[in-house]
Amino acid sequence: MKKQGLVWCLAATLATAVGAQELKPVILPAPQTDGGRPLMQALKDRKSTREFSGEKLPVQVLANMLWAGFGVNRPDGKRTAPSAMNWQETEIYVVTADGAYVYDAAKNRLEPVAKEDLRNLAGTQSYVATAPVNLVYVADLTKVTGDAGEKELFTGADTGFIAQNVYLYCASEGLATVVRASVDREALGKALKLKATQKIVLAQSVGYPKK
């Protein structure tokens, strides 16, 4: 009986440990849509920065930034950035030290994708692996019509709108950011469990500036 009890105890401990490692959805706080610097000041302060401190972004800041990038800003589900034909084909993957998530704008939450730290796959530059947050912009090509060239044009432009929104939010809040095309697309796509019809367009590192 003692042996059987020990086995059950070990099994329960293992199950608890495994459960603790599982990522759970993150319910984001409502975005704060008031305040911030005036638009002209944010445009003046907008810049690319490639050095980050190790400080994590508070969840409220993350929620605000994702909403600014491509959140829902109208009752009809339309977004803060335009997309051709209102396809809304771009998904934002959020890669952090704690794991990787995909932003669900309609529900204002992060859905878990991978529990590993994938930041080293989110870019080829050394600073990418230490930036607190790497946003990976992924286009769902099943939502886009046209030939290959047209799809590339549409998805590139739509992603650019989102990245600029993030730039302006970061300028408004004193955050450091840089958008990048250099991504290990094959390795990162596999780690993020992307489908063949999903294409990584750009990535963007975000954090507090290094002091």
Annotate each language-model stretch with its function.
Residues 1-8:
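Bacterial N-terminal signal peptides that target proteins for export
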Residues 32, 137-141, 208:
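Short, small-residue-rich loop/turn micro-motifs
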Residues 194-211:
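A glycine-rich helix N-cap at a beta->alpha junction
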